[in-house]
């Protein structure tokens, strides 16, 4: 069964996949198909764990392809911390795309933190709505990751080295 780690970004998805690389009965990647379109965008191998914040823009297609035949993780981090991290990246990446492409601001009309909070709330609401009728799901919070990741490990029937996986959470990957 496939596992999809849905998230806003800036919430530990890189570390999540580093931890999952200690699982022997699943493959795992971070943003592995981000440049693909059409059927190839969601063409993940079986028994694969994928973390990609852009999946929040493909929830309809994800539901059409996998429906309830996947495990879904809603990876979260305290919203003010996510906003602070995103605010440093207002001029590139997903936050720039959101501000200029979705909100249609050609220049910065609001503080970066306001744009970031709006993006975070929008993406989390979309993910929550998508997960409303899913049976194979779990919330994982960075603030309680030592407990939550063990629950995730058990939910997917992971095999491998849990202690090494948990140790990954002590390393700050992709920080800003």
For the regions a protein language model found, what residue spans apply to each?
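Short, solvent-exposed loop/turn segments at secondary-structure junctions
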Residues: 9-11, 22, 34-35, 54-56, ...
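Flexible, charged surface loops at secondary-structure boundaries
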Residues: 39-46, 65-67, 132-133
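A conditional alpha-helix N-cap/helix-loop micro-motif detector
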Residues: 52-55, 120
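A short, structure-level motif marking secondary-structure boundaries and short turns
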Residues: 1-2, 44, 112-113, 133-135
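C-terminal accessory extensions appended to soluble enzyme cores
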Residues: 157-176
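Short catalytic-loop micro-motif centered on adjacent basic/acidic residues
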Residues: 48-50, 138-141
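PAPS-dependent sulfotransferase catalytic domain
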Residues: 59-129, 136-139, 147-160
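PAPS-dependent sulfotransferase catalytic core
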Residues: 1-52, 175-176
